[in-house]
Amino acid sequence: MVGAFHQPKLVYMNMSVLKSLSKRLFNSGFGEIIKHGLIKDKEYYNWLKDNAESIKALDTDALEHMIYVSCNIKREVVENDPKEKGERALLNFGHTLGHAIEKEMNSSLYHGECVVLGMIAALNICVELGTITGEERDDALNTFALYEFPDHVTGIKIDDVVACLLYTSPSPRDLSTSR
């Protein structure tokens, strides 16, 4: 069924898998989790901030709630836009630049760390464009820090990242929501 779209009937998460991860790899997963709160659910985003210590301590109730809400956010977005013609593009927040950074760093940073760096760049651009305030950006930066994400990267050249972006980024037509 190549090219077919089917929504899952069930999402199963074995909590013991999370508890087997290294701290850095576990924290890396929060790039996607925090993104869900930022793009769709302020109450959930605030819950992630308020419960960071319980989550990082692998509290089962906190982890179950976090996974449940994040899966539902992603499910809702994908169901509302199965062919990625509008709202689903929100799930790509931080990913375009994040993937370029990931490639240029030869995967020495985890995917979630690179996505957060991409979100940080996007948030900085949003401040410059006036679509969010500096305080909103700083709040997100503080949340990323709660989950121990890097806030900058060294050892790569901006020209190489830009070249990677130009090679891998969607065309302007792909970015349009009016197809």
Language model features with spans:
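Conserved small/polar residues in nucleotide/adenosyl-binding loops
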Residues: 167-174
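Active-site segments that bind and position negatively charged phosphate/pyrophosphate groups
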Residues: 46, 50-159
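Hydrophobic aliphatic residue packing
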Residues: 2, 11, 34, 67, ...
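A glycine/threonine-rich phosphate-anchoring loop and its flanking beta-alpha core
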Residues: 1-53
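Acidic, His/Gly-rich catalytic cores of divalent-metal-dependent hydrolytic chemistry
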Residues: 162-166
